[in-house]
Design a protein with these regions (language model features):
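Alpha-helical transmembrane segments and their membrane-interface exit regions
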Residues: 61-64, 88-95, 180-186, 205-207, ...
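Juxtamembrane membrane-interface segments at transmembrane alpha-helix termini
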Residues: 66-72, 95-100, 186-191, 209-218, ...
């Protein structure tokens, strides 16, 4: 009887944590469903259908790089060129991981997935995450990460299906990722009094864009920004499972 009660209590807590994670991930859900839809449309327009959208979103799950990947697939780019381009486009994720790697290790078996699923939007949610008393923040963090990827996969698959059945003009859809990043920056700016990271990042980006051009500025700009901000106290915290 005691074991049954403990199991029931454990299941009840997990359900509460999942519900809380769903609520917290709603902003990302709205963005990912639309952006995933846009990616699915572009992928189908390039000649790759539903299953391509599903497996790319399942195993690649790289947001902006997936939009670039459509162009690379169409152009028949080599594997090495794709790897280099991925480093330039999504190299920023390495810097995200630096502030979470030790915390993720303490979460447990979900550690590898937490590293894999750390996108821009998930990173933003986990940085600001505060859970009610009695909930395990590590588990809520896992649920948020998993839900975010599910939103992206769903949007991608629906977009690919819609593109195969409806005559949709995809001109300008690739700008949707840029629009999302802009909204995130504006929201972060309004929600905090500390604007130094945004100013430093913006200045580094503009400088590298002028010096290196649009095709090669991103990774150097991120490197410069990370070096300057290394001494800044990090406010992101994800406790271990307990």
């Amino acid at each position: 009887m005691k074991l049954r009660k403990r199991l029931d209590l454990l299941m009840e807590n997990k359900i509460k944590e999942l519900r809380y994670a769903i609520v917290q991930s709603v902003p990302v859900m709205l963005g990912y469903l639309f952006l995933g839809f846009a990616f699915g449309l572009m992928l189908n327009d390039a000649g790759y259908g539903f299953w391509w959208a599903f497996f790319i979103s399942l195993f690649v799950y790289a947001g902006s790089m997936q939009f670039v990947l459509v162009t690379l697939l169409t152009a028949g780019a080599s594997l090495w060129y794709t790897l280099i381009m991925t480093l330039f486009v999504n190299g920023r994720h390495m810097f995200y991981g630096l502030s979470f790697v030790e915390k993720f290790k303490k979460i447990g078996a979900t550690y590898p997935y937490m590293i894999f699923s750390l996108t821009d939007e998930t990173f933003s949610l986990l940085c600001d995450l505060k859970v009610p008393e009695g909930m395990r923040e590590g588990r809520v963090s896992f649920y948020i990460s998993l839900l975010d990827q599910c939103y992206w996969i769903l949007g991608s698959c629906v977009g690919a299906l819609a593109g195969s059945m409806l005559p949709i003009n995809t001109t300008g859809i690739d700008f949707s990722m840029t629009a999302l990043f802009t909204v995130i920056v504006v929201n972060q700016w309004m929600d905090t009094k500390e604007h130094k990271p945004a100013v430093i990042g913006g200045a580094a980006g503009i400088l590298c864009l002028i010096l290196l051009g649009a095709d090669a500025f991103l990774l150097p700009a991120l490197t410069i920004t990370a070096i300057i901000l290394l001494g800044v106290k990090k406010k992101c915290y994800i406790p271990s499972e307990s």
